[in-house]
Structures are given as C-alpha cells and as structure tokens.
C-alpha cells in the first residue's frame, strides 16, 4: 500500500510518536480511495505495488510523496464480544496472490479494526489516542507481535473502536519483489 505518512497530530499526546504508520487511513492517507477501482485482493489490499502504480498512472495520481508499505496479518482476529480469537481467511471472490518484497524493513505491529469484515477501518493506537497510555515506537506501532497480542488480550483496546481486531506486521519497502510467498508460519502474507 502506498500511503502519505502524516506527522503526529497535535491532539495525539504520545510524545514518543514522530509519525503515524498505521494501516488505517484516518491519519496517514492511502494513495487514493482505492476500493472503487476493484483491483484489491481478498485482504482488501493489493497483491503487488504494480497494481497500485497502474491505478495511479491511469488516474493521474502522484505517488512521489508516498511511502510504500507491505503488511503481514496474523491469521486470527479478536472479537471483544466473545472475548476470543478466531481464524479468518481472505475474501475468496478476489484473487489473492501476494508478492513478497525482497527488501523490506519491519517498522512494528499495528492493531486495526475490521467491523465490516472487509477493508481496514481504524487503528486505535492512533485514531483513539491509545498510544498516550500504551507504549509504542516512533511510528505509533508496537515493537513486537507479543506486545500487540498482550495488549488486546489484556483488554487495552476495550471501548476504543468496535472490532474485531487484527494484528499487522508493518514494513516499509525499499525496492523489488520476490515470487509469491505465504510469509512466516505464524503470520499470513498480506501485501499492501
């Protein structure tokens, strides 16, 4: 996903945060309102940067001020109503053939809501200012998967945004892609 990364807004009082790398588009905008192009995959993101670049070229969208992100999603989502984790899969009516970047840098882990079970919605660390009371890194992300999961299991996301909550490894991409990959064993590949 190409995103226009925003600096920490003044209302977000988490002083350790410099900018917001969240998956949601509430603070750092996506390159476009991309759902309308119907080129996304079953995770409601993209299989490769080339798909996004084609949309941008066809629609006259400037990507020069955008950062390219790649995401890997934990294969379970947390439902606060049942207070438990359950498996989820990509939407089968969309082709999901994620291309893994050759040169990616892990920036941290985001927790994002999927109330409609389609596209990413809110990232409560930034959208609901949870980062003011939960330790995060300079990009408003958890440093580890374990920190993200423990925060959810510990109820720190209660009363923020309606879930379910999904955990995403968030990477910046430098250049290039490899062949199709399913990612690490514990996290399913999920291109941005």
What is the predicted function of each stretch?
Residues 38-93, 139-141, 149-192:
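Short, mixed-charge low-complexity intrinsically disordered segments
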Residues 145:
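C2H2-type zinc-finger recognition helix
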Residues 1-40, 70, 94-137, 162-171:
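Short aromatic-glycine-(Arg/Gly/Cys) micro-motifs in beta-strand/loop hairpins
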């Amino acid at each position: 996903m190409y995103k226009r990364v925003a600096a920490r807004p003044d209302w977000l009082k988490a002083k350790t945060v410099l900018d917001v790398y969240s998956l949601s588009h509430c603070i750092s905008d996506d390159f476009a309102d991309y759902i309308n192009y119907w080129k996304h995959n079953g995770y409601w993101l993209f299989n490769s940067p080339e798909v996004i670049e084609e949309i941008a070229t066809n629609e006259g969208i400037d990507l020069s001020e955008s950062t390219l992100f790649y995401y890997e999603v934990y294969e379970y989502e947390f439902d606060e109503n049942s207070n438990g984790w359950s498996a989820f899969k990509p939407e089968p009516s969309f082709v999901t053939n994620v291309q893994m970047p050759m040169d990616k840098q892990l920036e941290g882990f985001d927790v994002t809501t999927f109330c409609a079970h389609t596209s990413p919605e809110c990232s409560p660390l930034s959208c609901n200012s949870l980062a003011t009371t939960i330790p995060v890194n300079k990009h408003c992300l958890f440093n580890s998967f374990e920190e993200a999961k423990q925060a959810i299991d510990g109820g720190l996301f209660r009363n923020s945004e309606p879930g379910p909550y999904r955990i995403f490894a968030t990477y910046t991409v430098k250049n290039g892609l490899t062949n199709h990959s399913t990612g690490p064993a514990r996290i399913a590949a999920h291109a941005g």
